Amino acid sequence: MEQQQSKNIVHVSKLFVCTAVDCKDDIEEKFERSFVTLQMQISGLSDKEMHDMLSQAVCKDKQHEEISIGFLYIMLTDPSMAPKTYRDVTLVSRDGMNGIVTNLTFLVAEKYTKLTEVARRQLIWLLREFVKHQVLSVENVIWNCLRQAGGGDVSSRNLFLIESLLDIFIEFRTWLEGNPFLVQSTVYSFVRLIEDHANPALMSLRQKEVKFTISLIRERFHDIIPLGRDFVRLLQNVARIPEFEQLWRDLIFNPKILHQTFNGIWQLLHIRTSRRFLQCRLLPEMERKISFLASSVKFGNQKRYQDWFQEKYFATPESHSLRSDLIRFIINVIHPTNDMLCSDIIPRWAIIGWLISSCTNPIASANAKLSLFYDWLFFDPAKDNIMNIEPGILVMYHSIRNHPFVSSTLLDFLCRITKNFFVKHEDKIRIGVYNSLKLILEKQVIPNLQPLFESPKLDRELRNLIRDNFREFLSPSANLGQLLYPSMHPAQGYIIKKESDQRILHCENMDLHETGLINTSGSNISMLDEDIKISLVPTDLEIESVFSDETAENLKRVHNIEENTDDDDDLPLSKVRLKEKPRVELAESIAESFDAFVTKRNSYTWEAFLKDFRPLPASAFEEFQLNYVISNTVLILRETLPQQNIFSESKTEEKHLAKSISYPLYGLFRFLYENDEKSKKPFQILLSEICEGIPEIGYLLLYFMKIYCKLQTRKNSQHSYQFKTTIYRQICDAVDEKIGNCLIRDLDLLEKENTNIFLWLLPDIYREFKSIATNNTDLLRITLRCIDAKNVRDILYSVAQGKLTIFKQDGLIDCIRESLDFETYEQFCLWQIVQAHDVPLRCIQDLLPELEAGSHPEALSHFLLLLKNEEPTNEIIRLMLSRETKSKGDPFVTSALRFWCQRYEEKLSEIIASLLTSKYPSSSPNKRKRPPKGISVSTSTPSADQVLNHLEHYRRSCRHGTGTGLYVHDMMQRALQSAYSHSNDSTKKQFSDLFALAAEEDTTVGRRGGSGRGRKQPGSKKDVSNHGTSKKNAEMVKTIYSSDENSSEEDWSKSKMTQTAKRRKKANNDSD
């Protein structure tokens, strides 16, 4: 009946703002339902009756929560009833209002934007009451309210929340200072918010914020220090305010005045700011949206999400400052997993590139770039995370091809900020940037820096700036090229002034040059990156500004050449140089063919020239003639290679394959393939210069031979065309390097250029360069770093079919030993390939003593699987027991012994017993101890203590008698007895429980005296005796492990040892 009445009640929410299209979610329905339920319960009751009824109802957890939420609803929606309701809550609450605080925290975090105006004002009133009465956990609600005080938002609603929180902090300052984390969050938030309140209409609010924040910083500076480097970044944005200017001076010149343990601003810069503080400057809703974009949106489908985000959060001029907060959050908080990195989800660098490139405010743009590179300036590989510097390099690296303007502005900013951010500590900042770039290369975030630092799309000034700042990361040829050819584009050499000269940092108002720290706040920065457009085609004004008519003519000539070419590559300049070279008379035998090659530039004319040139001796050329031929040849071969798609699109279609090797350089390879005779010196010099001028020649030759042999074999099926490694050796000889080094270098370059072609060539490499490639760790690492699950599958197929042999048994152990420091995924792939080669365990078992549980889990896992398919042998057991034992034992050895005990218990027991017995001298002085059969003398032979340690840890692993049969066999019993009799007191004490498993040894003299040399004991009696002994041993061991929980193993061992000692004493007396 009551449910039917509640359904008929039409209730309009007074807590949430709802439109006609909004659907209520579970939270909203929960609050509404609790309010309606409470109203139905207390309607028409007096205060006393209501208190009595609620006091009984709150005893049930479910009703207690409903009543708490209902009261919270009333306090947030009815200002007149709120004080009385608060008193009622304090009377009936049985958890110190913890339930109300918890629900209020959740409400603020998830639904603050949907609260009505009345509810928001009542929220502030309720917070004030909570703080006044020091309700527990109210700081959680305050912290979530701070998060809702958004940056870049000067709307009246947001300003009301900011000022209300500020008033609470000022009024209850003592309470605030009692919570260090809340002090830190408050200071961090208000320093960020002050930046947005520069409008004269907000001056009174800003002054109140400044006064409160400065006093809190100075009085609680020991709590402020953990805020770290991002706090300094925020202080830069408010440095022009007089109070903060004085704080800056104290930070730099008089740090002890702030706190005795504070040593200066460099101490703050080396503290990484906690993620919680970076998170608190993003609205919870904004955080959810940006996290969704970085974790669920596919790369290429992000535009509509970015447009929505732009319209939602960047619609006002003040909102541009949010970009820095977002970039810092993405860099330090959003760290994608390996699965996400390998997926097609939009990467972090793409989001950051969008945030920077879409910014139209110069000041906000400079701050955004500083946020991107901020961790670079103080990077310490020992403490900092590479994920914090990865987006910076990737956004530049991936933008250089299609968006060179983004890369150039970021590179320019990085170069300038390295020098100007903190002049006093410029050397330390350079070390931080150097460490960043070095780790980026070590971890192979990008293959190398040359495509970025040496890109022809960068202007001359920026290339010079890069060379000055990052010379150690440039290739030697780039440094030499800068000296020989200062400008990659001829037109740039004549431009007198470019707008990029204006990209400098200006500091006004505060003389931060004397402090050594720049200021990137407000109007203090003039960054004109957005307006820079460097044109390679000079204007009429630029032509008029040159110094002479001759210079103008040269410029116009270059201009005409550039008009018909692509600005993005360097071909025009090469053609100009070629045309400007003076013509040199050559020998008649090559003059005609060389001219034809220079004119037509195709493979046919090139091979014809080579046929004429090869037999010529050195005497046929003057030095300048040979240099002329070589320089023109190398230039043409370089120019005629395609800049992109150098490899075939298809690996099967003859048309695509033939086209991919139709360029003149491949004509050289074809000529060498078809002509095996020894070359003259000029040809060798030409070949050497071609190799120097075209570093890719090695892997292009391998690619050519693969395709050429395939095509020729198809044309002539009766003749099989094979790789000719002699041609590759000629290339290696031309550069004066060993073939092994050349092969690894070329394959490394090929893998970075095109992984699919590298894997396609791999079987041929291992077949034709068998002696070099097999068991080659360097080649193996190149292969493992680029393969995925499908590639591993294909490699295993090739191995199984006999088309690919990566390992051979001899020397494999050294290869695996060097691979132990590979990445986990690489090692798992390696072991699958090893298993596909059917490598016997004996070839690699010597590694067993070297593997450590903490450092080599991948290898130990595979070895354990191999051992499960093997029978225990003397050699394997010797190697396993030679492993170092830790205090907690060796789980690897224990696991192997446990599964062997299930099938080979007696054999295993005999092997271990023989190994243990061999560690002690023979009991008979007249007999020389002979090593047990199958045990070889080796440096890996375990000591007696090692064997006992492993047996002891194995004993501890046994429960309720399982696996204890290892100790009951006669050989093991005698071995333990021998070990006991030859051990010192400390060893006996250490392994007392293990020795207690040995049955009492019968007197040797009595046993031997009872039988004559020529007599043989009846077999039945011996069998019965042995059976009785084994049964007795088994029962004794079973008794130890099957005892109930109340029995003490140590007490049993002590009593056992006492009994053993008595029996030994009696036996000795009988023997005497």
Curated annotation (Swiss-Prot):
The keyword Transport does not apply. GO terms for cellular component: cytoplasm; nucleus. This is Integrator complex subunit 3 homolog. InterPro entries: HEAT_Ints3_C, INTS3, INTS3_N. The keyword Amino-acid biosynthesis does not apply. It is found in: Nucleus; Cytoplasm. Pfam families: HEAT_Ints3_C, Ints3_N. Its main location: nucleus. Belongs to the Integrator subunit 3 family. Component of the integrator complex, a multiprotein complex that terminates RNA polymerase II (Pol II) transcription in the promoter-proximal region of genes. The integrator complex provides a quality checkpoint during transcription elongation by driving premature transcription termination of transcripts that are unfavorably configured for transcriptional elongation: the complex terminates transcription by (1) catalyzing dephosphorylation of the C-terminal domain (CTD) of Pol II subunit Polr2A/Rbp1 and Spt5, and (2) degrading the exiting nascent RNA transcript via endonuclease activity. Residues 920-943, 1002-1072 are annotated as: Disordered. The modification Phosphoserine is found at S1042, S1043, S1047, S1048. Belongs to the multiprotein complex Integrator, at least composed of IntS1, IntS2, IntS3, IntS4, omd/IntS5, IntS6, defl/IntS7, IntS8, IntS9, IntS10, IntS11, IntS12, asun/IntS13, IntS14 and IntS15. The core complex associates with protein phosphatase 2A subunits mts/PP2A and Pp2A-29B, to form the Integrator-PP2A (INTAC) complex. Keywords: Cytoplasm, Nucleus, Phosphoprotein.
